[in-house]
Regions:
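N-terminal pre-catalytic "stem/leader" segment of glycosyltransferase-like enzymes
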Residues: 1-71, 75-79
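Conserved catalytic-core segment of nucleotide-activated headgroup transferases in glycan assembly
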Residues: 16-30, 34-35, 140-141, 147-240
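A charged, aromatic-enriched C-terminal amphipathic alpha-helix characteristic of glycosyltransferases
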Residues: 20-23, 28, 141-142, 148, ...
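Extended catalytic core of nucleotide-activated donor transferases of GT-like folds
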Residues: 43-128
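Donor nucleotide-sugar binding/catalytic pocket of nucleotide-sugar-dependent glycosyltransferases
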Residues: 110-145, 149, 160-165
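Nucleotide-sugar-dependent
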Residues: 231-276, 283-291
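Conserved acidic donor-binding segment of nucleotide-sugar-dependent glycosyltransferases
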Residues: 268, 293-306, 313-319
Length: 357
């Protein structure tokens, strides 16, 4: 089959895409076009939804002449039914997912694309041949630090660290309080103005006394700044930082080990973004990060508060920051480039178009 038209079923709209839709789909579309593939968006919800009603999407795919349909992060009864309807109509299917295992979706589609080797490993052995890894591509490969500073950090002239998160953190994980010679800027999902103050009041009201005291200490700590994420500001903050932090609270798996906790299935996206900027990174070791960082060479791993203190102290040396930052960038820019990931995705699309699985 000569494949030309590829349909997409999305879990968020093009007008307001969630990060996974932007990175896994919209960033890939120009590369698909260059490869002679014509993308067609068959479905996009007004509000993000992983379990939308996909009735009539199969008919739309057939009407528009789609040879293959990619289902991005959608799952549930309607998504499984759609995959089966497409198969019955002779249309190949690919399930694109970044943060969970869904055996019914994997079984209903011709191939599954996941973002990490670890997420692939969580699937049953009998399904491994259907599962392919396409990482999140680095979105701003040109953005890079040009100055790693000459200071070692003092109380009066502290070094600057940046932590980029998709959450509205109410504490600095693991580290808790930065040393006197370091300021930390947390770029996250923070509200602004009156909405921010309302959120603080609501958070304080629901906390227990001990938690409330810790939160108040976090709020008044002059060495910690919390700012809202935006697509330009996040790169500005990273460019101004001396060090990047990714502290993750690795809580015990309350499910008894049958389901991996959310922190374990995180992609390496935030890590490679910071490394591509040329930042020396200290991170909590999680499965996806362990395949990227060579401890002490292109980044640091830290588990305990003591580990974090030792790694932070090592990066007070400006020469070490520069050396590690440059090594970090060199190790990820090609391997995790959008071009490289698009090549992998196109390879899967073409392979599925030529065979059953």
């Amino acid at each position: 089959m000569t494949l030309r038209r590829v349909g997409f079923v999305l879990c968020s709209s093009a007008a307001q895409p969630i990060p996974s839709t932007r990175i896994a789909v919209h960033n890939m579309l120009p590369f698909l076009l260059s490869a002679g593939l014509q993308p067609v968006v068959l479905f996009e919800p007004m509000q993000p939804s992983e379990t939308p009603d996909l009735t009539d999407v199969a008919a739309r795919a057939v009407e528009t002449g789609c040879d293959l349909v990619v289902l991005q992060k959608v799952h549930g009864t309607s998504a499984v039914a759609l995959a089966r309807q497409l198969t019955a109509a002779g249309v190949r299917t690919i399930y694109l997912v970044c943060d969970l295992t869904d055996v019914p979706m994997v079984e209903a589609t011709d191939a599954t694309v996941v973002v990490t080797e670890y997420l692939r490993s969580l699937h049953p052995a009998a399904l491994q041949s259907r599962i392919h890894v396409v990482h999140d591509g680095i979105e701003q490969p040109v953005a890079c630090k040009s100055d790693w500073g000459s200071g070692s950090g003092t109380r009066g002239c502290p070094l600057q660290a940046v932590l980029v998160t998709s959450a509205d953190l109410d504490r600095l994980p693991v580290v808790v309080r930065p040393p006197a010679w370091l300021n930390v800027c947390i770029v996250g999902r923070y509200a602004t103005g009156l909405r921010r103050w309302r959120h603080i009041r609501w958070t304080l009201a629901r906390q227990r006394p001990g938690e409330r005291l810790d939160y108040l200490r976090f709020l008044v700590d002059r060495r910690i700044e919390c700012i809202p994420w935006d697509s330009q500001g996040v790169y500005r903050e990273m460019a101004q930082a001396d060090i990047a932090l990714i502290p993750i609270e690795t809580l015990a798996d309350e499910s008894g080990g049958e389901v991996s906790p959310a922190w374990k299935v995180k992609s390496e996206n935030r890590l490679t973004m910071k490394m591509s900027m040329g930042l020396p990174v200290i991170a909590t070791p999680i499965p996806s990060y362990e395949l990227v960082i060579e401890h002490g060479v292109n980044g640091f791993f830290a588990r305990s508060a003591h580990d974090w203190g030792a790694c932070l102290t090592a990066l007070r040396d400006p020469a070490r920051r520069r050396e590690m930052g440059m090594a970090a960038r060199a190790s990820v820019t090609q391997r995790y480039s959008m071009e490289e990931q698009a090549t992998k995705l196109i390879r899967v699309i073409r392979a599925i178009s030529e065979s059953g699985h």
